[in-house]
Amino acid sequence: MDYADFDHQKLVEWLKAHGEKEFHAKQILSWIYQKGVLSWDKMSNLSQSLREKLAKHIRLPVLELVRYTESIDQETIKFLWRLRDGNLVESVLILSGIRRTVCVSSQVGCPAKCAFCASGQQGFFRNLRPTEIIEQILQINAWLSSKGEKVSHVVYMGMGEPLKNYESVVASIRVLSHPDFCNISQRRITVSTVGVVEGIKRLSKEGLKVNLVLSLHAPNQHIRKKIIPYARKYPLEEILESMDEYAQKTKRDITFEYTLLAGINDHPDHAHELAHLLKGKQCTVNLIPYNPIPGLRLKRPEKKAIKQFRSVLYGSHIVNTCRYTKGDDIGAACGQLALQEREGQTGLPMLKEVAFGS
């Protein structure tokens, strides 16, 4: 069993079944989720016999840190984790002012296969379990603790399509936001999706208050189908209706991400079409100039084209931002997460890079 399979009540029941006092449950959860201790041996206020029982029956930890790499500006750190089956996933820590945002992966690889995203080019291998998602935060929290800091925001924008691993993602959100666990406000948690309609509708009924982001990337279904194969399954009109439903039920504004690709979706006409598509919606468009990926012929638009695109949106009263690229020098920017060099393990290949501090 994994430790994340236990909430307080389940842990109390487990302790009683193994002849232990129930008050240990609060101690154990505090060690793991508040202190970031992922070793039974280091839980000093537990008896040796209890620690041995825990070690025998409950797995801890589930991720092994292979390496972490820091960007030149020291504002982005990419972590490479090995799972117990040998597969590898990545997380990114973004330092911005007082914010400490972690971009977590929800799958090994990604089934969406977006034309401009490195993760999608690698194919899909498997879903992550809730524990494997949660521990990305716990281990980075432990890494930050030496600086007296902790994770403040979580974005499900790493490897994978979160809503195609629905149960694990929702379970991880509940743990990360629970006051007795990581206590990260749901308003500081963001889930990104390419537009899995049934997942969006289901999420709107969960009673969660997380932010929802649609990876739109095109002003119409015709272009979207070309750059996002998943779009063939989900008509744009249905996706937008489900996003509206989410906004209405959760009272949360929604965000549309739009990767600008030179000569594909960056013309002023595309901007006018996008403005018409989103007219009347309480939303923000987050423009992302394409981050180059080796082997792909796609290009980032010129600054003039980006400025013109934004001007059209502003003129149509569409709130928009242009994301400042962070971590592109270490392959940690939006769309760049991928693993590029096999070392004999199963699943995705290992990232080719030099470990920070080596």
Swiss-Prot record:
GO terms for biological process: rRNA base methylation; tRNA methylation. Residues 96-328 form the Radical SAM core domain. It catalyses: adenosine(2503) in 23S rRNA + 2 reduced [2Fe-2S]-[ferredoxin] + 2 S-adenosyl-L-methionine = 2-methyladenosine(2503) in 23S rRNA + 5'-deoxyadenosine + L-methionine + 2 oxidized [2Fe-2S]-[ferredoxin] + S-adenosyl-L-homocysteine; adenosine(37) in tRNA + 2 reduced [2Fe-2S]-[ferredoxin] + 2 S-adenosyl-L-methionine = 2-methyladenosine(37) in tRNA + 5'-deoxyadenosine + L-methionine + 2 oxidized [2Fe-2S]-[ferredoxin] + S-adenosyl-L-homocysteine. The keyword Ligase does not apply. It comes from the Bacteria. Keywords: 4Fe-4S, Cytoplasm, Disulfide bond, Iron, Iron-sulfur, Metal-binding, Methyltransferase, rRNA processing, S-adenosyl-L-methionine, Transferase, tRNA processing. Coiled coil: none annotated. Belongs to the radical SAM superfamily. RlmN family. This is Probable dual-specificity RNA methyltransferase RlmN 2. It comes from Protochlamydia amoebophila (strain UWE25).
